[in-house]
Amino acid sequence: MNDKGVYQEKYTKANFITRRLIDGFFKATGELIAGLDVRTAVEFGCGEGVSTRRISRLLPTGAVFEASDFDERLVQAAQALNPNIRCAKESLYELHRADNSFDLVVVLEVLEHLENPDRALREICRVARKWVILSVPREPVWRLMNLARLKYVTSLGNTPGHVRHWSSRTFRRFVGLYGVVREWRTPLPWTIVLLDVGE
C-alpha cells in the first residue's frame, strides 16, 4: 500500500480538469451509496483523510463512520482533517475488527497497490455485514491518460506503486468471487463497484 501520496496529490495539486474528474468520481460513489441502509461504515486505506471527508458527506445522516490506514503518519493527518471521525492504524491484511462489523465498507484506490489483493478482499468481506464499495483505476484508460499528459512515460503510463491492473470487466469478475456485484460505475478513468456480501 505504498505510494498513497501519489493518489492524494490528485486532491492537493489538482488542476481544473482533474478536479472535475474527481468530482465525477465521488458523484458516482454517492450514487452507489444512495438508498443503502447504512448505520455503520468504515473506509479502509483512507490515506490523508481527504476521501474520508468526501465519503462522510455521502452517508445517511446519523451513520457512524470510521476510517483507517496502515501508515501512522497518514492516520494522524486523516484524524487532523476529520476530528469527528475515529481514525485508526491497521493493515488490510489483518483488520482489527469483528466479523460483520459494518453495514458498508469503502476501499478506494487501494487494491491496485497490493501484492495480495485476494487476501485483503477476504478481510474486507469478513468485516462487512452487507455492502462493500471498491474502486480501482480503469485500465488501459488510466495509463493512456497518463501517457497523453506525458506522465510516467518510461513505465508506459503506469503510476508508481500500481502493481495490479484491471479493466472494468476483469475487476468485476475478480470481486464477484467474493460477493454479488449489484451495481457499478465507470467515471473516467475509474471503475467503482457495489458488492453485496450479505447473501
Name each model-derived stretch.
Residues G62-A63, A128-K130:
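A short helix->loop->beta-strand "cap" motif at the edges of active sites that frequently abuts
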Residues M1-A98, D118-L121, A148-L150, T154-E199:
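Conserved N-terminal segment of class I S-adenosyl-L-methionine
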Residues V106:
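A conserved beta-strand element that flanks and buttresses the S-adenosyl-L-methionine
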